[in-house]
């Protein structure tokens, strides 16, 4: 970064405090979910450190892999393992939540279908062909990877993300259903 030295020292101090506070939170907090979020703060602070060192790709990989995958995996595994709390209104609150989720997901699905149907794919293909002229201008590998992911491999990339989302929702649903069948009647 081309900033004055005093500003760089201030930014590094803030990043170091984020790493220190996040690490202390991981160790000292009793709730495992709060510890997981503290771990996320630590990972984000480390990625900011990489940004200061002009390692943009490493910073992006840090955020995507550690914060986006590992930290989310920890939070979901904790949510799946914890026993549900005793609640008398569990069935009504669950039905209300299911209905709200159904409405939101159905409206999102219909919105996406309408966008897909209204998109003129032939124009997108012609734009893609016209951008081939500018391909030699790209200098770094990060720019080439980003260009390929957003042009040639856009549809497989998005389909893979939807597939992972469906697998995650299915795993959560299966875990909740198996937990409901395994609990004795006095705990429900």
Swiss-Prot record:
Q: Which InterPro entries match?
A: NAD(P)H-Q_Oxidoreduct_6, NADH_UbQ/plastoQ_OxRdtase_su6, Nuo/plastoQ_OxRdtase_6_NuoJ
Q: State the Gene Ontology terms under molecular function.
A: NADH dehydrogenase (ubiquinone) activity; quinone binding
GO terms for CC? chloroplast thylakoid membrane
Protein name as it appears in the record: NAD(P)H-quinone oxidoreductase subunit 6, chloroplastic
Which cystines does this chain contain? none
Q: Which reaction does it catalyse?
A: a plastoquinone + NADH + (n+1) H(+)(in) = a plastoquinol + NAD(+) + n H(+)(out); a plastoquinone + NADPH + (n+1) H(+)(in) = a plastoquinol + NADP(+) + n H(+)(out)
Question: Which species does the entry assign this protein to?
Answer: Psilotum nudum (Whisk fern)
Q: How does it assemble?
A: NDH is composed of at least 16 different subunits, 5 of which are encoded in the nucleus.
Q: What does this protein do?
A: NDH shuttles electrons from NAD(P)H:plastoquinone, via FMN and iron-sulfur (Fe-S) centers, to quinones in the photosynthetic chain and possibly in a chloroplast respiratory chain. The immediate electron acceptor for the enzyme in this species is believed to be plastoquinone. Couples the redox reaction to proton translocation, and thus conserves the redox energy in a proton gradient.
Q: Which UniProt keywords apply?
A: Chloroplast, Membrane, NAD, NADP, Plastid, Plastoquinone, Quinone, Thylakoid, Translocase, Transmembrane, Transmembrane helix, Transport
Keyword RNA-binding found: no
Q: What Enzyme Commission number(s) apply to this enzyme?
A: 7.1.1.-
Q: Which family does it belong to?
A: Belongs to the complex I subunit 6 family.
Where in or outside the cell is it found?
Plastid, Chloroplast thylakoid membrane
Predominant location: plastid
TM spans (from-to)? 10-30, 32-52, 61-81, 97-117, 153-173
Bilayer topology annotation: Multi-pass membrane protein
